[in-house]
Every structure is written in structure tokens, then in C-alpha cells.
Amino acid sequence: MAEIAAEKGLLDDPIILDKLGEARALCEAARLLTYKVIDIRAKGLSPSADTQIARVAGTNADLAIGNLALEILGPEAMEYGSFADANFRLAMTAGVAVGATEVQLNLIAARFLGLPKE
């Protein structure tokens, strides 16, 4: 997305820069959390709340990239089959594919934070 923003001359916009940074941070967090879950599973340990945290992080990263693509690309993002279209469709289904985000957050609250179930 940064390359596309640069091509469109949007890197002077502080709001775009902020959103690019946020999206990158969300992607990096999702990547690291996913590696942590893979490591836990590779060691033969039981799944932990880290699994739900990684799922929520991945969903948040997908949504951030999808929304950013729509903002940077403007109307061309709506072209069927474009990068932005494909990414946004992935982002919209990501939360459902890994379990509703609300369910994941409830599992995190109960398992990781020790909060009562809703």
C-alpha cells in the first residue's frame, strides 16, 4: 500500500502516513502472534488464549489494509477483481472465517484475562 500511496503522491498526507503506519503495525503484530501460536503448537502444547488473540489481530490487520486500500485507491478500488476489491472481500470474510470477532474477544476475556463470561 505504501508503494501505491507513493505513486499517487499521497505520502505528504499525514493522515495517510498515520494509517499506513497503523496498518503495518497491525500486520506485524498479527504475524508475530501467529508465529507464537505456531511455536506453541509445534512444541505439542495445548492451544491457549494466544490463538484467539492471533485471530483477532489477523482480522484487525485485514480490515485495516482493506480500508486503507479503499481510501488510497479511491473509485478504482471498486473495480471488481482489483487488488483493493480482493483485499476488502478477504477482510470482510476474515472475521467470520476465524469465528466472529466478538466470540474471540469473549474467549480472550475468559481464558486470558480471567474475566467472567458474558
Locate predicted features.
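Alpha-helical interface subdomain recognition
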Residues: 1-118
